[in-house]
Amino acid sequence: MSDWNPSLYLHFAAERSRPAVELLARVPLENIKYVADLGCGPGNSTALLHQRWPAARITGVDSSPAMIAEARSALPDCQFVEADIRNWQPEQALDLIFANASLQWLPDHYELFPHLVSLLNSHGVLAVQMPDNWLEPTHVLMREVAWEQNYPDRGREPLAGVHAYYDILSEAGCEVDIWRTTYYHQMPSHQAIIDWVTATGLRPWLQDLTESEQQHFLTRYHQMLEEQYPLQENGEILLAFPRLFIVARRTE
């Protein structure tokens, strides 16, 4: 599990793209020239940007070779760069930085967010969506299973919080629109929840384990999910998935 799996990620493409659609709808820009899609993955969010601004120069950035290859194949009219978001530098100031479900993987948002704002044109926009599920059972149970089985904590850090992001971006010279939405995804089984998180949040926990250790981890994780997520009357499961949205526009 050394690299991301585009096929597994796109298994829930509609559910993963919906927050990007809703974030994009709140971006207050019309005619723009330069756009970056940070953590573009297989290009599903980049495609939305290209549809809205077909004449813009759109650059997708991702650290995964597999994801970049998939995005290039799907969107030949866009540019894609394999790079670490923290180190990537655009060739010119940007009108829009779009980051859908990517920045939560990176540390030290107190430095990262002002850095991203500095890459914008005057009145440019930073649009961010991040899963805010660190305290949801899906992610709490990952930590509990790892503790039970004496594996190191490899999960991501919790988000800084609404008030912190507002202060960070206000001090960076932005007007800030911030909101939180909880989606309730209809899942056919507990295994479907595992399939979902294996493509994203569960990756760091599994990537350094042997095949036998992975199976042991997933068996226990499945048992604990059954305890936390009861079946609905029709046999499905409602998976609560909170997400934090931020649209910050430079005022100078």
UniProtKB/Swiss-Prot annotation:
Catalytic class of the enzyme: transferase
Gene Ontology BP term (one): methylation
Coiled coil segments of this chain: none
Molecular function GO terms recorded: trans-aconitate 2-methyltransferase activity
Statement: the UniProt record of this protein carries the keyword Methyltransferase: yes
Source domain of life: Bacteria
Subcellular location: Cytoplasm
Assigned keywords, A-Z: Cytoplasm, Methyltransferase, S-adenosyl-L-methionine, Transferase
Keyword Repeat appears in the UniProt entry: no
E.C. no: 2.1.1.144
Function field: Catalyzes the S-adenosylmethionine monomethyl esterification of trans-aconitate.
Family the UniProt entry places it in: Belongs to the methyltransferase superfamily. Tam family.
This protein's name: Trans-aconitate 2-methyltransferase
Organism per entry: Escherichia coli (strain SMS-3-5 / SECEC)
